[in-house]
Amino acid sequence: AIIKSENDHIDWYDKNKDRPYWETYREYLKSDKQFSPDAVSALDKTTDMMMRNIEDPNRKGAWDSRGLIVGSVQSGKTSNFIGFLNKAIDAGYKKIIILSGLNKNLRQQTQLRIDEGLLGYDTAFMKNGVRDFKGPLARKRMILNLKPIHSATNSKINGDFKFTAAEHFMNIHTDEPTVFVVKKNKSILESVIKYFLNAPSVHGVSVESKPFKIKGHQGDYNSFIKDRPILVIDDEVDNGSVDTGEQKLNEKGEFDPEYDPKTINSRIRQILNIFEKKVYIGYTATPFANIFIHHEKKTKEEGLDLFPKDYIIDLPIPSNHSGLEKIFNIEKVDGDVIEDREIDDNYFFNIVKDNSLYHDDPDCAEGWMPPRHNRYHVPKYEYKNDDEVPIPPSLREAIMSFILTSACRNFRGYVEDGKSMLIHVSKFQDVQDIVYKQVSDYMDVLRSRMQAGHYLHDETISKFEEIWHK
């Protein structure tokens, strides 16, 4: 589904033109990542839809394209924007910024995915711009003699953007694609701003004199990049990017142009404001904060706010996605939820009854994780044997199921692929910390019991087998 505005958009995209970066990525997904033909075809269609809604990078004059992509939780949004970026580079976009969360871990995770699916090399081993091309995607691109895609950041935990390092090696790559994977951090975003405001010396691009300030820094910059568009992907756009302050109206009924937005929102908008041609695309599973941004909000220093003024695309749910409809057995007819659907063999949702002492009492405050508890709650499930880790049987079974699932994936050749299990049972960090310790202890117990000769080895194997046959 797509919602489009009536703004000044010019149709331009021809999917029948040569798209070598996309074609090598598509072959990589099919032959090396074992994506089904249907999944690759669906990705091709949705990314074509996105390309048709942005502007031609060679379009003359000033233009500003802003959109929002909405996808279900864990439904492949990162794969989608990597596919889209391959097509954008094929079309001629050269400078790409990916805003990837508020902390270094999230940034690193995104960089690893970009290394794998867009760059084709591990940026952790990059030194002074020299890349170590290894892996199937890199080989496919080397055969076609494609230009390398440069990275201003790397996949080390502290591999975020650094102005001095980028200036050192990127000034010789004036017309080749360059990707920045950065976290939403004040100092990092200001370093990116400074880098682009030094465009005449770094890039040799056409600039126009335009006074420009960076808040908190003295002096004016005088760069306005005219002939090279910027493409910004804002991952989890509802987290950190939205201005949560109140921009009031002045006596003319207009938004106060001197208003000071929240820091991250301000710096993102300033990056966009440096460029005459710009594309900004936000990705989220929860779009409500973004669609309620007022479409006329703007300031003198930041320009327009981040409202998706041109289009909103609702990504289709992949056929292999186990989302809330499957987990909670929800059936929809014409958008309406059918609540009394009969439980069938595909019903994923397991009603947990051992989390509290009195499961049917919503006010119960006793047991391992009752519905009502505070930050001082100590989760404890009582066993006859005091040596047992105090987590309930349902969580033990869930952990063992995850171990079996991971073993299956390893057996099928996905040893290097990430595997994770989320255990989120309390809104209180202190309580979650206790649960983390309990789960870690239980993992140690399982490892011990799986050792040959342990007196509970056979019993543990039998439990795994029982879960396998469920």
Task: Show which residues each predicted segment covers.
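Low-complexity, highly charged intrinsically disordered N-terminal segments
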Residues: A1-K60, Q111-L118, D122-D227, L231, ...
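Phosphate-binding P-loop
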Residues: E55-R66, Y414-D417
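Walker A/P-loop
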Residues: W63-F81
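Short hydrophobic/aromatic beta-strand immediately N-terminal to the Walker A/P-loop
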Residues: L68-V70, I97, L422
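Walker A/P-loop NTP-binding motif
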Residues: T78-G92, R113
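Conserved SF1/SF2 helicase motif Ia
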Residues: A88-L106
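Conserved P-loop NTPase catalytic core
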Residues: F125-R139, R228-D234, D243-R409, S420, ...
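Conserved strand-helix element at the start of the C-terminal RecA-like helicase core
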Residues: F180, D417-V435
